[in-house]
Amino acid sequence: MSLEDLFERSVEALRERGVLFAVAGGFAMDLYRREPRLTMDIDFAILTKTGDVGTATAIVESLGLHAGLAREADLAGGPLFAIRRRSTRPCMIVGRPAENPSGEGVDLLLPTLPWVASALKRAQANNVDFGFGPVPALTIEDAILSKLHALRRLRAKDLDDLQSIFEAQREIDIPFLAGQIHSFAIDIPRQAEPFLPDWLVKLSHAADRSTRGRHKP
C-alpha cells in the first residue's frame, strides 16, 4: 500500500468511528514550509468520544498496522525512571508494519499533548484537499506550536520545519501564537534559539519569566 493510499484509508477509518481529527506532522508542515520534505508517516491529532488510547489502537490495527504506545517520557527522552515505570501519560499511538517497524505508518497524537485540543477545534475550519477531498489540517499557528513543543527533543527535522515555515514568510497570527506560547509555557531550548526569529525567542523568554513568577512563594 502506498503512503497516499494509507493516508486516505486512515481518514476513512477516523470518520467511521466519529473521531475528531486533523492532519498534523509532515503533511501539515508541507502546507506551510518553503519547500516540501520527505515523510515516512502520516500524523493525525485526534479526540475521541470514548477512551482515546483504546479507540486509537483499534484504528491503527484496522489499517493492518502494529500499534505501539508512546508516553510523555518516551518523547521527551527521559527521565529514565519514568520510562521504566511507565509513569507518564500516553500521548501517541504509533502504527507501523509488524514486519518492518521502520516502514511507513500512522501516528495518532492524543489530547494529553497540550496543544492538541485547541488545534483540533481550529483545524475544523481549515480544510485542505490532499487528493481525496477536504480534510481538516493544522493551521500554520498550530503547526508552529506543535513543533515548538517537540523542540525539547532537539530533533533536526523539528527545527528544520520551523526554519522553513518562517523562511516562507507566510501570514501568522502572532498575538494568538504569543497567547498559546504563554498558556502552554513553551520554552525554546537554548541550542535552538540562534536558528529561530528573535521575536519568537523573546515570546518564549517572556512566557518563561511569567511561569517562574507564578511559581514564586
Predicted regions mapped to residue ranges:
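Compositionally biased terminal segments of proteins
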Residues: 1-217
